[in-house]
């Protein structure tokens, strides 16, 4: 499932297995009926999402929807805030900075000693593929794959995938029976709601600024986090980008310097 769906989706331009190749009738391959087409789409496609989108999804007749897009299997990208291992599962709290952290549960095989049963440590950026679930009105993911990011560009790529996938799916679901895309673009309007503000951090900061702020917040030392530590932990960012983020956060009152000009603490720290 992983290789034929999730990875092929990530490495393709929304084509091939797990992709979103558009045809006049909607999804790429012909289908005997609209119901079967939708069922096949839910079963086969893994839809990239933000946590904000997942938390706002509606559940009707055991089907999750974001706007007019049906979802079942999804991917998210975020940072692990907390990890707790039980005998049969691992529960992570994953934060993509679009909403509150989301619970992600990964079931483990007690007889299997492979890396699948290894707890990924907190403060690790990961890509998660799983099934959206709701229990007592609380949404969570049941993961079938959790993979640490090797390159932070994957974070940016995921955001672009979120926009594109929901745009394509919204258009497909908005098409009339004749197969021609409507002139007035409700799909684009929906996609704007999906891919516009929803993937931006809720606090109005950029992804880079949030990464710097979260590292400073997480530092337990009384003197705070020093600039060298920021550089060591944000190797994907240039020194000038880190400095710009620090200067912005300081000017906006999110952080302050402590023992010297190179140590910073969050104003939200307890």
Swiss-Prot record:
User: Mind giving the lineage of the organism this protein is from?
Assistant: Eukaryota, Metazoa, Chordata, Craniata, Vertebrata
- Can you name this protein? Replication protein A 32 kDa subunit
Name what induces it.
Translationally up-regulated in response to DNA damage (at protein level).
Enumerate the UniProt keywords alphabetically: Acetylation, DNA damage, DNA recombination, DNA repair, DNA replication, DNA-binding, Isopeptide bond, Nucleus, Phosphoprotein, Ubl conjugation
- GO CC terms on record? chromatin; chromosome, telomeric region; DNA replication factor A complex; nuclear body; nucleoplasm; nucleus; PML body
Q: Which family does it belong to?
A: Belongs to the replication factor A protein 2 family.
Which InterPro entries does this chain map to?
NA-bd_OB-fold (IPR012340), RFA2-like (IPR040260), Rfa2/RPA32 (IPR014646), RPA_C (IPR014892), WH-like_DNA-bd_sf (IPR036388), WH_DNA-bd_sf (IPR036390)
Primary location: nucleus
Q: Cross-referenced Pfam families, in alphabetical order?
A: RPA_C
Residues recorded with modification N-acetylmethionine: 1
Q: What happens on changing residue 29 to D?
A: No effect on DNA synthesis following DNA damage. No effect on cell-cycle progression, nor DNA synthesis in undamaged cells. Impaired DNA double strand breaks repair. Extended DNA damage-induced G2-M checkpoint
Q: Where is this region: Disordered?
A: 21-41
Q: What is the effect of changing residue 254 to A?
A: Abolishes interaction with RFWD3, leading to impair DNA interstrand cross-links (ICL) repair
Q: Where is this region: Interaction with RAD52, TIPIN, UNG and XPA?
A: 187-270
Q: How does it assemble?
A: Component of the replication protein A complex (RPA/RP-A), a heterotrimeric complex composed of RPA1, RPA2 and RPA3. Interacts with PRPF19; the PRP19-CDC5L complex is recruited to the sites of DNA repair where it ubiquitinates the replication protein A complex (RPA). Interacts with SERTAD3. Interacts with TIPIN. Interacts with TIMELESS. Interacts with PPP4R2; the interaction is direct, DNA damage-dependent and mediates the recruitment of the PP4 catalytic subunit PPP4C. Interacts (hyperphosphorylated) with RAD51.
Q: Could you tell me at which residue positions the Glycyl lysine isopeptide (Lys-Gly) (interchain with G-Cter in ubiquitin) crosslink is annotated in this chain?
A: 37-38
